[in-house]
């Protein structure tokens, strides 16, 4: 819905160039149609992640952009991947209870949190990095600490260079430790590139649905909760649950 009027209208109101957003989406739509897998970013992503899950047990797919501006994009991907691929039945109606678990992260913040788990925890994850490779508005670290040997080497670099070095180092560390990862590189982060990313991930989800043999366009798993909510709120035609207490409940009382 992000590229439909539901998403485009509020984006335009907030100052986003909707035409550029759609232009980027159209660009991704074109190259994601090619039958040559090596030239189809969406198809390649879906295939690699499905193989990692089905053959290697890597059921957790981590999207980790190295940009604070893409933090919300990670959460958008989490919603897209989860609601589209987590299904009880395959296309033939067989009970399968399948689907990968998406996990949002952001660099460099999660290098000092989740990467510990990615490096040394269960071999059940694939990390998908998003790297900004072009020239961005950047800040030079500066040489005002040149007299301090432990940080003097940073004087000729920028914060962007430092972040990118940390991203490349993290990817290499994961690789050396046998942890699967892939990287999408974008030159800049603007409306056109964002539209391209939205479309690329959306098409990858459709391809993944075919590989998992599920319908990625329905969301039956959320319907029961909606209907029970209607019943609890008194909507006509809907009944509240017979019991409202959870199986286990802890109550924290004020002292």
Task: Tell me the role of every PLM-derived stretch.
Residues 1-128, 133-137, 221-255:
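Active-site phosphate/pyrophosphate-binding segments
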Residues 1-26, 161, 165-168, 179-227:
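Short alpha-helices
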Residues 143-154, 211, 242-255:
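Extended, charge-enriched "interface" segments that sit outside catalytic cores
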Residues 29-32, 58-66, 95-100, 149-156, ...:
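Glycine- and acidic
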Residues 43-46, 50, 54, 143, ...:
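N-proximal short alpha-helices
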Residues 97, 103-189:
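Helicase-primase coupling helices
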Residues 37, 45-47, 156-157, 167-168, ...:
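Short secondary-structure boundary micro-motifs
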């Amino acid at each position: 819905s992000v590229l439909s009027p539901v998403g485009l209208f509020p984006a335009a109101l907030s100052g986003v160039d909707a035409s550029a957003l759609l232009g980027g989406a159209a660009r991704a739509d074109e190259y994601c149609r090619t039958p040559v897998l090596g030239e189809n970013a969406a198809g390649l992503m879906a295939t690699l992640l499905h193989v990692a899950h089905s053959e290697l047990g890597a059921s957790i797919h981590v999207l980790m952009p190295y940009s604070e501006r893409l933090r919300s994009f990670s959460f958008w991907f989490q919603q897209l991947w989860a609601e589209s691929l987590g299904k009880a039945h395959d296309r033939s109606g067989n009970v399968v209870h399948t689907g990968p678990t998406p996990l949002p992260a952001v660099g460099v913040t999660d290098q000092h949190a989740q990467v510990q788990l990615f490096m040394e925890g269960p071999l059940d994850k694939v990390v998908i990095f998003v790297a900004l490779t072009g020239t961005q508005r950047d800040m030079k670290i500066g040489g005002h600490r040149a007299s301090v040997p432990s940080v003097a080497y940073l004087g000729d670099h920028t914060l962007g260079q430092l972040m990118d070095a940390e991203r490349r180092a993290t990817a290499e560390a994961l690789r050396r430790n046998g942890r699967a990862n892939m990287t999408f590189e974008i030159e800049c982060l603007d409306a056109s590139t964002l539209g391209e990313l939205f479309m690329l991930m959306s098409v990858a989800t459709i391809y993944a649905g075919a590989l998992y043999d599920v319908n990625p366009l329905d969301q039956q798993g959320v319907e029961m909760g909606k209907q029970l909510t209607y019943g609890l709120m008194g909507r006509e035609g809907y009944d509240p649950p017979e019991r409202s207490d959870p199986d286990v409940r802890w109550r924290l009382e004020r002292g």
